[in-house]
Amino acid sequence: MDKQEKSLIINEFKKSENDTGSTEVQVALLTARIHQLTTHMIANKHDFHTKRSLLTLVGRRRRLLSYMRNNNGAGYQELIANLGLRK
């Protein structure tokens, strides 16, 4: 993910002008990175280092989503709808 792609994601999910670290932004950035690593893993099945990194990112996103579900239920529902994470 390059700087331009990252800034587009931040601009889409930020809450205020200087927001770069809110839970929504973090989850959106992690989701983009997870999608990149998933496509890499399809092409490179034996890349175990990347597989471990992918599982770490998925766990981090899961914890952030759990935090958000417990503290901001409406924002959680909106975020997963925007990212298309759950049905």
From Swiss-Prot:
One Pfam assignment: Ribosomal_S15
PROSITE patterns: RIBOSOMAL_S15
Stored SUPFAM superfamilies: S15/NS1 RNA-binding domain
Any one annotated GO CC term: cytosolic small ribosomal subunit
Keywords, ordered alphabetically: Ribonucleoprotein, Ribosomal protein, RNA-binding, rRNA-binding
Domain of life the protein comes from: Bacteria
GO BP terms: translation
InterPro entries cross-referenced by the UniProt entry: Ribosomal_uS15 (IPR000589), Ribosomal_uS15_bac-type (IPR005290), uS15_NS1_RNA-bd_sf (IPR009068)
Molecular function terms, GO-annotated: rRNA binding; structural constituent of ribosome
Function: One of the primary rRNA binding proteins, it binds directly to 16S rRNA where it helps nucleate assembly of the platform of the 30S subunit by binding and bridging several RNA helices of the 16S rRNA. Forms an intersubunit bridge (bridge B4) with the 23S rRNA of the 50S subunit in the ribosome.
Family membership: Belongs to the universal ribosomal protein uS15 family.
Subunit structure: Part of the 30S ribosomal subunit. Forms a bridge to the 50S subunit in the 70S ribosome, contacting the 23S rRNA.
Designated name of the protein: Small ribosomal subunit protein uS15
Organism: Dehalococcoides mccartyi (strain ATCC BAA-2266 / KCTC 15142 / 195) (Dehalococcoides ethenogenes (strain 195))
Gene for this chain: rpsO
